[in-house]
């Protein structure tokens, strides 16, 4: 795995946004503490259950918190924006730490979603930087490969 320069807060809740395929989920999974609960909203049945009844997420999260989970990771939160209100409530009640990933804060704002102002820090993960790629990245070779790929169609 490529070491990313972005650091997530260790104790505070966090909303991590960025373009698709930039490594948001991979980054979060690499720093999750043991016992964290992960909810993947790319799993259609999971997203549908919570979209149908967002309070189900709160009840399940409270059960996980009661069992000792102190960090809850919700991947692709833009799939079920109503969960942000439940997360807000859970942060207030239980002081649990949430890490939420999504591709577009702008889309959530337009939809009137609760972006947890004052309760979670917002971070943005950009595509890899040259510093993150390090010495193993050969720009000339990459350009040649792109040219070959483009030429072949």
Where are these regions (language model features)?
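Short glycine-rich substrate-engagement loop in P-loop NTPases that contacts/grips substrate
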Residues: 39-71
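Structural recognition of the conserved hydrophobic beta-strand(s) that form the central parallel beta-sheet
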Residues: 73, 97-103, 124
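Conserved lysine of the Walker
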Residues: 24-25
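Hydrophobic anchor at the beta1->P-loop junction of P-loop NTPases
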Residues: 16
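Conserved P-loop NTPase "ATPase switch" module shared by AAA+ and STAND
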Residues: 65-83
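Interdomain motor-coupling "hinge/lid" segment immediately C-terminal to the ATP-binding subdomain
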Residues: 111-153
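Pre-Walker A adenine-sensing motif
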Residues: 1-11
């Amino acid at each position: 795995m490529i070491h990313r320069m972005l650091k997530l807060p260790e104790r505070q809740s966090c909303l991590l946004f960025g373009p698709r395929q930039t490594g948001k989920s991979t980054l979060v999974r690499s720093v999750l503490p043991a016992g964290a609960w992960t909810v993947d909203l790319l799993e259609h049945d999971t997203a549908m259950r919570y979209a149908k009844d967002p309070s189900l997420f709160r009840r399940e999260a409270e059960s996980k918190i009661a069992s000792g989970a102190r960090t809850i990771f919700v991947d692709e939160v833009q799939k079920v924006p109503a969960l942000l209100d439940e997360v807000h409530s859970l942060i207030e009640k239980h002081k649990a730490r949430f890490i939420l990933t999504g591709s577009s804060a702008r889309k959530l704002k337009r939809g009137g979603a609760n972006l947890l102002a004052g309760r979670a820090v917002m971070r943005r993960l950009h595509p890899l930087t040259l510093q993150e790629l390090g010495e193993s990245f050969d720009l000339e070779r990459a350009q040649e490969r792109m040219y070959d790929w483009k030429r072949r169609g």
